[in-house]
Amino acid sequence: MAEETQHNKLAAAKKKLKEYWQKNRPRVPAGVNRNRKTNGSIPETATSGGCQPPGDSATGFHREGPTSSATLKDLESPCQERAVVLDSTSVKISRLKNTIKSLKQQKKQVEHQLEEEKKANNERQKAERVLEVQIQTLIIQKEELNTDLYHMERSLRYFEEESKDLAVRLQHSLQCKGELERALSAVIATEKKKANQLSSCSKAHTEWELEQSLQDQALLKAQLTQLKESFQQLQLERDECAEHIEGERARWHQRMSKMSQEICTLKKEKQDMRWVEQLEWSLSKLKNQTAEPLPPEPPAVPSEVELQHLRKELERVAGELQSQVKNNQHISLLNRRQEERIREQEERLRKQEERLQEQHEKLRQLAKPQSVFEELNNENKSTLQLEQQVKELQEKLGEEHLEVASQQNQQLTAQLSLMALPGEGHGGEHLDSEGEEAPQPMPSVPEDPESREAMSSFMDHLKEKADLSELLKKQELRFIQYWQERCHQKIHHLLSEPGGRAKDAALGGGHHQAGAQGGDEGEAAGAAADGIAAYSNYNNGHRKFLAAAHNSADEPGPGAPAPQELGAADKHGDLREVTLTSSAQGEAREDPLLDKPTAQPIVQDHQEHPGLGSNCCVPLFCWAWLPRRRR
C-alpha cells in the first residue's frame, strides 16, 4: 500500500512537471520567421538568433542605409525578447529546482512516514500478540476462579453444617453445665454442713495441739543445747585425732629414713660378704690345682662377733617392722573407731535435725497455711543435697582409710616375708656344708626407687585423707550453722506471734468462714484447716516419735553408743521413717475420719506417695492437698 501511494505521488509530480514545461516553454516571434523565409540566403544568421557579423552589417549598412536601420530594430526586438525569455527561464529553472528540492523533502517525509507506519504496524502486531496471550491467561484464570468458587461454595456448605452441629453441641454442653452446677451446689451445701459439724470439734483439738507444740518447742531447745555440746566434743576429738595423725606422720618419716639408711648399710655388707666368699672360693680352687696336693684349708668364715652383730641387726629390723605393723594396725583401728563415732554422731545429728524440721514445719503449718509451702520445698531440697554431699564425703573417707590401711599392711607384710626368706648363693651352701651355725638370712630389701615410690604414695594418701577430713568439717559446719540459723529464726518468729495467725488460721472456721469473703486466701486457710482436722490422729504418732527421741537423747554420750541402737539402726534403717509409717498405718486402720469424703484424698495421697512422710510430713501433705481444694 505504501509503495503504491508513493508511485502515484511520483506520477502526479511528473505530470505536473510536464504541464509546467509546456506552459512555460518560450515562443518564437512572427518577424523572425519571416526573416528566415525572406532571407533564405543567410540561414546562419537566422539560426544564430538574428545576429550578423560586423562586416556584413557594415557592408549592408553602407550598402543600404534605410533598410539596415529597420532590420536592426527588427533584430533588436527579438534579442530583447529572448533575453527576457532567458531571464524568465532562469527564474523558472530556479523555481523548478526549488520545487524539486521540496519534492525531495516531501519524498523523504513520505518515506519517513512510511517507516513510522511500518514501525507502528509492527508495534500493533506485537500488541495484538500480547493481547492474545493476555486474553488466553485471563481465560485460564477465569476457569480457575470458577473452580475456586465451586470449592468455596462446597466448603461454605460444609462449614454451615459444622456450625449447626456445634450449635447443637453447645446447647447440649450448656445443659450439662447447668446440671453440673446444680450438683456442685448440692455437694457444696453438704460439705458446708459437714465442715460446720467438724469445726466445733476441731477448735478444742487445735488449742490442745498448740499447747503441745509449745511444749515440743521447749524440748527442742533442750535438744539443741545438747547437740551443740556434742558438736563441740566432736570438734575437740577431731582436733586430737589430727594432732595424733601429725605426730604419727613425723614418727613415720623418721623411722623410714632410719630404715632406708640401715637397708643401704646392709646391702653394702652383703655385697662385701659375697665378694669375699667368691675370692676365697677362687683361692681354694687355685690351691687344689697346684701340683702338690695340700690338705684343704677351712674356708674363711666371718667372725662370730660379726655374725652376732648381723643377727642382732636383723632381729632389731624385724622387731621394728613388726612394731610398725602393729602401730599401723592400731592407727587403722583408731581411725575406724573414730569414723564410727563420727558416723554415729552424724546420724544422731541428722535425726535431731529431722525432728526439729518436722516440729518446725508442723508449727509453721499451724501459723501459715499457704504462703510458706514453696520455701519449705526449697529448704528441703537444699538440706537433702547437703545430706547427700556429707554422705558421699563420709563414704569417700571410709573407702580411702580402708585402702590406705590395706596398702600399708600389704607393704609391711611383703617386707617381712622378704626378710624372712633364706639367703641364696655359694657362700650359703659352703657354710651349710661346713655344718656351722648358719646365721639368719640377709633381707632382700627392695631397691631405693621402689621404697621412695611407696613412701610418696603413702604420703599422698595421708594428704588426701587430711584434705577430705577438712572438707567434711567444712560441710558439717555449714550444714549445722545453716540449720541453727533457720531454727532460731523460725522459733523466734513463732514465739513472737504465738496466738496471732495460728489461731486465726486454725480456729477461724477454715475455708467455710472465709468462703463468705470469696477470696483465694479464704480457700487456702480453709484447706489448711481441713488438712489439720483430717491429720489430727497422725500427729499422735509424731508426738510418740518425739517422746522416743527425747528418751534416746537422755542416753550415754556420743562416744559410746549402745549396741542395741546400732543393731536396730542396721536392721530397720531410719528410725524416723519406721516410727512415722508404723504409727500412720496403725492409726489409719482405727481412724474414723477415713470414711468421710474430706479425709479420703489425704490418705490416698499418703499411700500413693510414701516418700512424702520421710522428708517433711505436714507441709508437703498440705501442699499436695491445696491444689485439689482450689480446683
UniProtKB/Swiss-Prot annotation:
Alphabetically ordered keywords of this record: Coiled coil
Keyword Coiled coil on entry: yes
A GO cellular component annotation in the UniProt record: cis-Golgi network
Ranges of compositional bias, category Basic and acidic residues: 568-577
Presence of the UniProt keyword Coiled coil in the record: yes
InterPro entries recorded: GM130_C, GOLGA_cons_dom, Golgin_A
Skewed-composition ranges (Polar residues): 38-50
Stretch list, region Disordered: 1-72, 422-451, 502-523, 551-610
GO-annotated biological processes: Golgi organization
Protein family according to the UniProt entry: Belongs to the GOLGA8 family.
Protein name (database record): Golgin subfamily A member 8R
The organism of origin for this protein: Homo sapiens
Gene that produces this protein: GOLGA8R
